[in-house]
């Protein structure tokens, strides 16, 4: 049997009735092609089963058409927290639409950061999406020194905003919404399980809690503030600490749904009813909140949209469509359920 000849760029051009250069521009995502011509080329590619030679394309474009999504946490936290699933989904969809793929990497220790920095600076990827950064993360400096473009997921702490691109959630507004809900439902001893204070989400959700209390003429009481790291186990410890310090607490705003779920279970174990004795509001509006017992009121943050926008900004930087830093802040809203 005669072996079928592998389709070539020239065969695609002939079938589409265009030049070889036009086919290259379509494959490389150039906007210098009319919609009708682009569709003709795509039809020819599909009909012939043409697969671009990625190695040859990389030599010409000096691009890999690959980006890295780097989560500055350990693997256990990445797969335990529902926040990351929405981000990964949004990133994947947006990159696929632009002809890019991505690799997922994690790292929190110094050794992991050093390894990651070497990989990211080694021309394996065209750009980097940075997620869940802490104040001391060295990766942005490594990328700057290597000339690799990147976009933050979340406003970075300690960095002049005008110098960087990021997509963030309105964490202050979300913290304010959660606390206002508890105030409006008649609660007066409102505690919070805040997130880590070396991350912008932890800092700003606590700020929103404080602002809501002060706006209502209520005192900000440090004894009603405990801290976790967004995980379930940290929420258990924080809720127990709050009950030891303030047994008369009548409401809790938890800065993540996992910490909110932990609060629900600790309260139940202590003999307190939710929401009759203590109301609870979480943050994420994840399936954790939806299936909690009772179902948990929670702040909805558009994580899939956040992932999409992060990917869009980065690809625009890689392709030269934008050169200036871009900053986006996405709105939150409250999903009211039975817990508060």
Swiss-Prot record:
Keywords: Cytoplasm, DNA-binding, Repressor, Transcription, Transcription regulation. Residues 1-61 form the HTH lacI-type domain. It is found in: Cytoplasm. CDD domains: HTH_LacI (cd01392), PBP1_LacI_sugar_binding-like (cd06267). SMART domains: HTH_LACI. One of its GO terms (cellular component) is cytoplasm. Pfam families: LacI, Peripla_BP_3. SUPFAM superfamilies: lambda repressor-like DNA-binding domains, Periplasmic binding protein-like I. GO terms for molecular function: DNA-binding transcription factor activity; transcription cis-regulatory region binding. Residues 9-28 bind DNA. InterPro entries: HTH_LacI (IPR000843), LacI/GalR-like_sensor (IPR046335), Lambda_DNA-bd_dom_sf (IPR010982), Peripla_BP_I (IPR028082). Coiled coil: none annotated. PROSITE patterns: HTH_LACI_2. Transcriptional regulator that regulates the expression of all six cellulases, encoded by the cel genes (designated celA through celF). Acts as a repressor. Specifically binds to a 14-bp inverted repeat site, which is present in the upstream region of the cellulase genes. This is HTH-type transcriptional regulator CelR. It comes from Thermobifida fusca. The gene is celR.
